[in-house]
């Protein structure tokens, strides 16, 4: 059952887009969601499921923003955010540039373009990953590039 909410409201978000799911025998992102389902077991509202990329996904209609899932996440990739701000960084990778891309094809690479472009000063790059200060963000949409595209599976190609 969906919870009727007044806008703005709080809900959990998983800071991983799923590109870290590696092919068998290859190393994936050490900072992303591992699909352990601890968050699912903890959520009393059935608001979390594992998506087709093996990553936890929150249904904002069901989530009440209690933060129970965030407390049990072993990777610390779940946090509660203000849903008035629709811009979120769905990445927790701490590697920089090519090393990050090697682990995850949709990783934030810590280049700082978003930080330089944000006129409100709401975005900072910390540990090679963009972080949005929601209390400052204007949700202007200028940096929709932060909403990373769908991941593709990594696979080893042999010739």
Residue ranges and their predicted role:
Residues 1-35, 40, 46-67, 79-110, ...:
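Ferredoxin-like iron-sulfur electron-transfer modules
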Residues 146-152:
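Conserved small/polar residues in nucleotide/adenosyl-binding loops
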Residues 74-77:
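Anionic-ligand-binding alpha/beta catalytic cores of soluble enzymes and soluble regulatory domains
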Residues 152-153, 157-159:
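Positively charged, low-complexity/disordered segments
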């Amino acid at each position: 059952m969906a919870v009727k909410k007044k806008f703005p409201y709080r809900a959990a978000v998983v800071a991983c887009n799923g590109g870290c799911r590696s092919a068998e025998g290859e190393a994936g992102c050490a900072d992303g969601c591992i699909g352990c389902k601890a968050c699912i077991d903890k959520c009393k509202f059935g608001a979390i499921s594992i998506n087709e990329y093996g990553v936890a996904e929150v249904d904002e209609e069901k989530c009440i923003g209690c933060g129970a899932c965030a407390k049990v996440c072993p990777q610390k990739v779940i946090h509660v955010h203000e849903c008035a701000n629709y811009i979120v960084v769905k990445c927790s990778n701490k590697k920089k540039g090519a090393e990050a891309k090697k682990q995850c094809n949709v990783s934030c690479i810590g280049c700082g373009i978003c930080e330089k472009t944000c006129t409100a000063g709401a975005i900072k790059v910390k540990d090679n990953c963009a972080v949005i200060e929601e209390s400052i963000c204007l949700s202007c949409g200028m940096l929709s590039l932060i909403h990373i595209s769908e991941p593709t599976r990594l696979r080893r190609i042999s010739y």
